Amino acid sequence: MRNNPITSDPVVSTLKEQNQGRIAQIIGPVLDVIFPSGKMPNIYNALIIKGRDTVGHQINVTCEVQQLLGNNRVRAVAMSATDGLMRGMKVIDTGAPLSVPVGGATLGRIFNVLGEPVDNLGPVDTRTTFPIHRSAPAFIQLDTKLSIFETGIKVVDLLAPYRRGGKIGLFGGAGVGKTVLIMELINNIAKAHGGVSVFGGVGERTREGNDLYMEMKESGVINEKNIAESKVALVYGQMNEPPGARMRVGLTALTMAEYFRDVNEQDVLLFIDNIFRFVQAGSEVSALLGRMPSAVGYQPTLSTEMGSLQERITSTKEGSITSIQAVYVPADDLTDPAPATTFAHLDATTVLSRGLAAKGIYPAVDPLDSTSTMLQPRIVGEEHYETAQRVKQTSQRYKELQDIIAILGLDELSEEDRLTVARARKIERFLSQPFFVAEVFTGSPGKYVGLAETIRGFQFILSGELDGLPEQAFYLVGNIDEATAKAMNLEEESKLKK
């Protein structure tokens, strides 16, 4: 741990005499810098350019060394706009990689790729910084136990359980509830696991980043009155920023998460939205650095770059980083190198369905499309596995019968199929759940449902014990006892109406 060489002026001033170069060439966000012989900076070192442009505006640009070209030249990628830079300007080598603030003081704040706060709430109250380029934990440090990461969300825990220290792909279009699901997970990990979350907005729209921040303040995930009680740190590198910033913002968020895992020994949730933009930014940088493109025009180092990020996301004996990554699939082509490389690292997929959202079933997680490598009898146990498989079979049969129902109606089905449809509709509604973060909008209190309660509830529905209850009794409730209580209330209400 050291003082941040980027933001701590005393460090920069001592380096001024030591290692100084000059800009030789500017190619958009890429700079060539000449250094004195024998004083070449290392790969990934941070370089700083300070000065004034032609109209007297202050310039403060940080770059990262990417290539050593020979003849005392290095090629660096800028982390902010290069407007106003000129050939011949002085460049200071900080002698260290980019470092960002870490620790509890980062919670409730918004940072850029350099770890500078951008929320107008003043400086961050910490002197502890970590470099963003770090090795993945050694094999000896890894926790090899396969354990489920309980989220308290029924549909996730039962049908596509998350692995502690695993990586989950989140697939869903606009307006199907991705943000609300993310916020509920942040809320639940804080309450149930005493953990914290880090959100990395990689190549996001600025509006989306702002909306997320506002919604987090409304729902209490970020506590405005006491910022230290917030449950999440936000790191943004928006669409309008240079590719260097978008390529490195994921590492900045991951570095903050690593501190909570390794030093505070906590369980951490790391959100990356969107992992495709990380690949896209790497592709832009690769082209600017003059590398030959590979398949479909992507960078030849695609697998290496993805691996260097993903391998740091893991469980150690101290704590865990469980990562949930939104995955954009270009032109819905799952064989595209970007999503295909991502899939190789995922332990589970959570697919959000527009059809379920249209029915008002939230969270709109598709029970048939969502998958998990953890759903095996030797990991989750025979009871959990058996229940999940029966829920999927019932839902699948209902899906197959929907066309027949639409054309001929329910009456034309066999007695057995009618029973299957009735139970499937109850299951579909019971997979919905009121969220804590949606309380302010819906007025109904949120529910955290333990895994044992979830399994018990679905076993009751599948056994046929609750066939006599109306299906609306299962909509937006927590455990099965609430559903039976709701059924009694509905019955009393209908009697009063008569």
From Swiss-Prot:
One of its GO terms (molecular function) is proton-transporting ATP synthase activity, rotational mechanism. It comes from the Eukaryota. Its EC number is 7.1.2.2. It catalyses: ATP + H2O + 4 H(+)(in) = ADP + phosphate + 5 H(+)(out). ATP binds at residues 172-179. Pfam families: ATP-synt_ab, ATP-synt_ab_N, ATP-synt_VA_C. It is a peripheral membrane protein. Keywords: ATP synthesis, ATP-binding, CF(1), Chloroplast, Hydrogen ion transport, Ion transport, Membrane, Nucleotide-binding, Plastid, Thylakoid, Translocase, Transport. GO terms for biological process: proton motive force-driven mitochondrial ATP synthesis. It is found in: Plastid, Chloroplast thylakoid membrane. GO terms for cellular component: chloroplast thylakoid membrane; mitochondrion; proton-transporting ATP synthase complex. Its main location: plastid. InterPro entries: AAA+_ATPase, ATP-synt_VA_C, ATP_synth_F1_bsu, ATPase_a/bsu_AS, ATPase_alpha/beta_chains, ATPase_F1/V1/A1_a/bsu_N, ATPase_F1/V1/A1_a/bsu_N_sf, ATPase_F1/V1/A1_a/bsu_nucl-bd. PANTHER family: ATP SYNTHASE (PTHR15184), ATP SYNTHASE SUBUNIT BETA, MITOCHONDRIAL (PTHR15184:SF71). Produces ATP from ADP in the presence of a proton gradient across the membrane. The catalytic sites are hosted primarily by the beta subunits. Belongs to the ATPase alpha/beta chains family. F-type ATPases have 2 components, CF(1) - the catalytic core - and CF(0) - the membrane proton channel. CF(1) has five subunits: alpha(3), beta(3), gamma(1), delta(1), epsilon(1). CF(0) has four main subunits: a(1), b(1), b'(1) and c(9-12). This is ATP synthase subunit beta, chloroplastic.
